[in-house]
């Protein structure tokens, strides 16, 4: 399952020297590649997801949406109850200010048990020979 509201239409790297093909219509480009019937796609703001939008509580979540502290906090806070009782959460762009900190606050607020985590932080932004802008991988239990 994927969720997007297409609020970010300017998809490109921060560094100008990094080659990235121009994507004129990210929605059309994504949906063209999203034809496998095993997957569902929900076009709405993540904060307005309901249990009716998903068929089962996901146990593996890859989050690559807003990464400002409050944006990520509000997004995850809105959907954490939709996740399975034990789940893997992968946060993209963990190098960005607020990503790791907002996740720590979500863990506290929802009294989640941190079973395992790995922070893969990089020193060079958008390094195509490394983990781009970092990842934080967590195994959590409600």
Task: Identify the residue ranges that each predicted region occupies.
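S-adenosylmethionine/decaboxylated-SAM
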Residues: 1-142
